């Protein structure tokens, strides 16, 4: 009798309405908090060059040993970042990553940040090792795919301060040679006065 009573319970519940909820619930997903630690992103400068300089500090800071970086030197013919070096190989193993954010704190150029995207489930273990192409931020309007020369500023200081080349309008200060150039001239005058006083 025991086996037949089990079949009876199964037969009764077969036609009941299911209470299982699908995941994710379409239209009911809550927005993630802005400071949530999701997947990583390699950022770009406004002209499209990569911010990563291949210093490997993120890999050294990672407690799970999930990051692999291989740096290389930029050349005048092939420039991927504004500095001397760039990250030629950049991989994050999400099977090991604990999303702690220590790599973000270690990055000196703010090249590495974390997004709110956390849905990275997949059926293959190999797909959890994200490469540089998958981690790089998409090109926005006005950006150019590297390699290419620096498009901002006359020298490295101007580039990292976001100043345009001489003769071009600075979107922050107005017409050419008014804001940023005037500021540079003031700095030079102050420096010359200090040198004369010494």
From Swiss-Prot:
Residues 42-72, 88-117 form the 4Fe-4S ferredoxin-type domain. One of its GO terms (molecular function) is 4 iron, 4 sulfur cluster binding. Residues 137-198 are annotated as: Disordered. One of its GO terms (biological process) is aerobic respiration. GO terms for cellular component: plasma membrane. It comes from the Bacteria. NDH-1 shuttles electrons from NADH, via FMN and iron-sulfur (Fe-S) centers, to quinones in the respiratory chain. The immediate electron acceptor for the enzyme in this species is believed to be ubiquinone. Couples the redox reaction to proton translocation (for every two electrons transferred, four hydrogen ions are translocated across the cytoplasmic membrane), and thus conserves the redox energy in a proton gradient. This is NADH-quinone oxidoreductase subunit I. Belongs to the complex I 23 kDa subunit family. PROSITE patterns: 4FE4S_FER_1, 4FE4S_FER_2.
